[in-house]
From Swiss-Prot:
Residues 59-65, 152-165, 269-283, 370-384 are extracellular. It comes from Drosophila melanogaster. GO terms for molecular function: odorant binding; olfactory receptor activity. Pfam families: 7tm_6 (PF02949). GO terms for cellular component: dendrite membrane; membrane; plasma membrane. It is found in: Cell membrane. The lineage of its organism: Eukaryota, Metazoa, Ecdysozoa, Arthropoda, Hexapoda. Residues 1-37, 87-130, 187-247, 305-348 are cytoplasmic. This is Odorant receptor 46a, isoform B.
Amino acid sequence: MVTEDFYKYQVWYFQILGVWQLPTWAADHQRRFQSMRFGFILVILFIMLLLFSFEMLNNISQVREILKVFFMFATEISCMAKLLHLKLKSRKLAGLVDAMLSPEFGVKSEQEMQMLELDRVAVVRMRNSYGIMSLGAASLILIVPCFDNFGELPLAMLEVCSIEGWICYWSQYLFHSICLLPTCVLNITYDSVAYSLLCFLKVQLQMLVLRLEKLGPVIEPQDNEKIAMELRECAAYYNRIVRFKDLVELFIKGPGSVQLMCSVLVLVSNLYDMSTMSIANGDAIFMLKTCIYQLVMLWQIFIICYASNEVTVQSSRLCHSIYSSQWTGWNRANRRIVLLMMQRFNSPMLLSTFNPTFAFSLEAFGSIVNCSYSYFALLKRVNS
């Protein structure tokens, strides 16, 4: 089924983590097992954040060491926000899948089917390419110690014992791997499903635009009744889209806002780290790791900002699309409905962050990048 490709594999992983609501018919042992899975990943994240915090306190006077901690600390904070948000809002968020599979969002023409298929292909390609690049970045983080004669651990967190001993080193290395990979996949899953939901919302708006533009002229008296019915269907369809948009915003708003704030910390720390490296000093592999991770972080915030911006663009076309229909020959009642719909369509859809005046958009993405570079330049000047 085409619609299932928008979310299928991501929901499976959410179920593995124990953050997605089980069906009402689930047995008690399934619910207990789900709670155990959620507790396991929550404890791992909590221990990671605790060890990162201790490492930061131990090196409070050394800027570069603190920024090395921020390299992953901020990312894990956003992971914790995503995990807790999904668990706390699981009952409401389960309605997303029900809404997407609802016949109310079904296609009515071959052209609409083509629109849905194009977005499905785009979603699958983005999920796969983003997943491959993210896993590649995580693998590099784990592999880099091999090029340093195992002189350091993959993540800059507190060492619970001396890494000079092989048993202690590999025990901590294994712990770092167990911590890093599930949270990496959580990021991939959440970000790709957020993009999928926004794309599905966008294609619903495109379908509504198409239906409004196809509203035809009045040739016979009974055509006014047919047009009145189609207008009411479009108005009801728009109301369903708005309700779906509210669910999507609930999914994205909290974790996405935390992600934007954490991204600034990660981008600044990566830029500062790269500015202190030199290929001549044998830092090529470390620079490659940081560059790829930087690209993943930029991609992570770009996909949500871009898809949200597309929703805003498509919703802003609604008013023009209904005006483009052949409304001049309709009766007064239908023209009144058109006027009411145009007033409703006048405000485009925005997916806001915690700050109501700051929405997810390409402008927001540009602001994040500019802000990160400004903080980096200031930090570099202060420490030069």
